[in-house]
Structure formats: C-alpha cells, structure tokens
Amino acid sequence: MEKIPRWLLFSLISSVLCILGALCVPLLSVAFDSKRNSQSKLVNYGLSLSAGSMITTSLYMLLPRIEKSNRFKVFPGLLLGICLSFFLNYLVHAFASESLVHCADSGDHATGSHIHSKSHSHSHSHSHADSHSNFSNDHDLENAPSEHGYATSSSSVSENDPLITKDSDRPQMKKKMSLIDLLTRRKSEGECCDLNKCTPLLQSEQPEYIACVPPVIKSSQSERNVPHGCEGSEDNGQSDDKDHRGLVCVENNIGYDLENLSLYRKNFLSSRHHHSSESPENYGSNQLSHSFSSPLGNDVTENPAALADTQYHPENGSLYPHHHHLETPFSKLLSIGMQTCLVLALHKFPEGFIIFYTNRSDSSKSLGFSIFLSLTIHNFVEGFAMTLPFYTVFESKWVAILITAVLGGGSQPLGALIGYFIFKGSTPRDHEPNMDFLLSVTAGFLLVIGLQMFQTGIGFSDGHHHHQGEGDEEMKQSHSSGTTCLKWCCTGVLLILASALFT
C-alpha cells in the first residue's frame, strides 16, 4: 500500500479534530442537563469562548500584514467582509424576526397591542411578574369613545359583524412596507417602523406623539412590571414621581429572552406555515389576528375585537397602526450559526490549501508540521463554535452535528485537494499563491461574527431569569454574568495565541 501523502494525512486529522470539537457540545449539554437552567450557561459562556477565538483568528492569524504591495487588497477585502456579514445578518433577521404591532391611540385609555400575557418568572433585576397582566380590559373596549367611527357598545357588535366599518370620513391606513416586509412577503398591520419612531411621552412635550406601548402596569408584587414596551407613562408624564416607573425596552427584553427560546422557535415555524397558506383574498381578515410572542416568551395572539380601539382619530390623522420587526433569541442564534458555518467553511479552504502547499516537498517539511500543530487547537475550537448556535436553536440536535461534520470536516481536505490539482506537476517555487484579498474578506466576516457572539453571550447572560420559589443553591446554579463571559472570551483568545507557539 502506497504511503499516504503528508498533506492529506494532516488535513484528515484536522477534520477529525473539528468533528470532535462539535461532539463536545452534546457531551457538555448532557453534563449540564442535570442542573436546572444550567444549559444557558453552556450557551452564554460557549459563545464567549468562541467569540474570543474568532476575533483573535480574524485579526491575528487571518488578516495579512499591510504592506506597500498589498495595501489596496487588505483593507478593501476587510471592509467587504464586514459589509457582507452585516448584509447576511440582515437577511436572516428579516426571515426569522418577530413582528410586533403597535396601535395608535390618544392616550386617554389603554393603548397597545392588547396582549394577555402570563408569566411566572421575573428578570435578573429580581422584579416579579404578575401571573395575569392585561394591557387592556373589557371595560375600556365597551366604553370606547364614539369618535373612533365604530359601535361603542359591546352588545351591538357580534362575531359576524365587520371589525372595521366603511367610513368615508376616516383616513385610510398608511401602508409602508419595509425591505423586510418585501423579502418575507409578510402582510403586517400598518407601516413598518423603527422602534426609535415610537416617541415616549416622558421625553416629548407634544401631545400628538404616541407612547411606545403599553403604559405602565402597576403590580402589587413588584416595584416595576412592564414586560412589553420601551418607555412611557400612563398619565402622559403628569403623574406623581412615585408612579413614574421605567419600562423594559421591548427590543432587548425579547431579543435576549433565551429561557423561552423554544416558544420563539415554535412561533417562527407556525408563522412560516401561516404566511405560506395565506391567500390575497382572505388577507383582510388575517391581518387582524397577528401572532407574535410576548417579551417574556408567551405565545400570544391579538384579540381581533380589541383592534376596534386602533382606528384613526379625526383630530389627528397622522396617527396610525404600525409594526416593528424584532430580533429574537431564535433569529440571533440562527444568524450566528449560519454565518459561522459559512465563514469557517470558506476559511478552511485556504487552510487546506496552505497545508498542502507547505507539505508538498521535504524542504518545507518542518514549516508544514508547525502549521499543522498550530491548527490543531484552532480546528477543535472551530468545531465547537460551528455547532453550539445550531445545537441550541434546532429542535433536532443531530442536524447541528451533521452540518459541522459536512462543512467543517469536509472543507479543509477539499481545499487541500484543490491545491493538489492546481500545483500538480509544478515546482515548489512556481505559482506561489497570493490570497491576501480572500484572507482579508474572511477576516472581516469572522470579526463581525466574533463580536456578535460576544454581544449575544453577554445579553443572554445579563438577561437570564430567576423564578419564584427557587432556593439559594438553585439561584446560584442558574446565575450567569457578563463578567464571566469576558473571562471565557479571554480564554478563547489565549487558546488561539497558544496554538501560535508551534509556528
């Protein structure tokens, strides 16, 4: 049997190490499974470890040194990689984000999405949540003012009556679709707005502005309990100081609600099915029952009858229902996982190429072996980083392992094989490759992913939940902090720098 070429052997060993790194994720998951809520630690600290390794890999190992000969390749390539990463991140969130409806109102009575949410958890700030938080009540709906242009008595409205009456005097709803709406073909209520366009009443002296819904909910159990909204006040900012209570920012409260990841995943899958089966002729009815997830992860559907309170006010035609697209833990991890697998797979092609090029002759034997040793730890950590986001976000865990095995385990040998066919029959000094631009693009891509991982790990960690009735030991086991995420990030940096000792 002919001896296996050194470059092929090194490539196969690197692939096996990548797959072993991927298998560490389910093993650690089983180890943490015996402790309640401790799997969130694996996600938070694992993302931080991967972030440190990726940031160091991008800036220290991949990014070429800027010299006079390549200065017009390195920086443009880095910039292109960063832009591509942001664009791909935007596309993923466009398809996987939650759509939240905000409804315009005068502020005289409860406004908002009319959500009926239930929660038995409270945030890390140790504020307890009411088990039944209603942002509007039946009394408000029954006594809604007649200026809305619809029946004011609940007895006069049956289930068969139209929710929106044909009133020629009522201004038409402004419909402005965003790029996200166009990409996903979603038919959401009103205009797509940025969260910053919801001007809080506490920061505005102009009464025509609408508070970011809902108003403050007063709870007998907590100092503050507002699971849904950004800022605002129940009394247009005129109540006493003791009634001025901050509102949890809905974007951060939803985006880092890792504990209820399964609900956001279920919401995403059900909404995909809903939008695919929706036809233009029944759009008028479907848009009034917009499904989304509450900030605390409860699966919520708007009450269609409550949307009678969202009509235009004749005195202010500029106010209209609108919606926001919010990132969720599902969309964040899905985006990170897709980008990580894509970039690391592309990154392993030049790695395999380099392994072949430095091991093709006896003269470069020592250099090729040192590069192989430096890539051992590197490949192990990369396998872990590729698997963790998908393993967390997918319901079928074996899919995450399979993706890493195919992309991570197969890309490096494939890159070495491509190098073999390119340089077959040439002398070692012929056709020396210049991959500065390709490495710069990959470095820019990897840099953004690493920063996203670190941001997400800290957000998940600082936004974790404690539960009523937990003992001191349970709270200690489920507790995680951003400071510990920083330590794990530094550990990832040291792992990559330690691998450079062999070069």
Swiss-Prot record:
Superkingdom per UniProt: Eukaryota
Protein localization: Vacuole membrane
Any matching Pfam family: Zip
Stated family: Belongs to the ZIP transporter (TC 2.A.5) family.
Biased composition (Basic and acidic residues): 127-142
Topology of the protein relative to the lipid bilayer: Multi-pass membrane protein
Function: Transports zinc from storage in the vacuole to the cytoplasm.
Name of the featured protein: Zinc-regulated transporter 3
GO biological process terms held by the UniProt record: intracellular zinc ion homeostasis; zinc ion transmembrane transport; zinc ion transport
Entry keyword Manganese: no
Major place of residence: membrane
Transmembrane domains' residue ranges: 8-28, 42-62, 75-95, 336-356, 371-391, 398-418, 438-458, 482-502
Phosphoserine modification, residue list: S178, S188
GO molecular function terms listed in the Swiss-Prot or TrEMBL record: zinc ion transmembrane transporter activity
UniProtKB keywords: Ion transport, Membrane, Phosphoprotein, Transmembrane, Transmembrane helix, Transport, Vacuole, Zinc, Zinc transport
Annotated segments matching region Disordered: 112-171, 221-244, 274-295
Residue stretches of biased makeup (Polar residues): 280-295
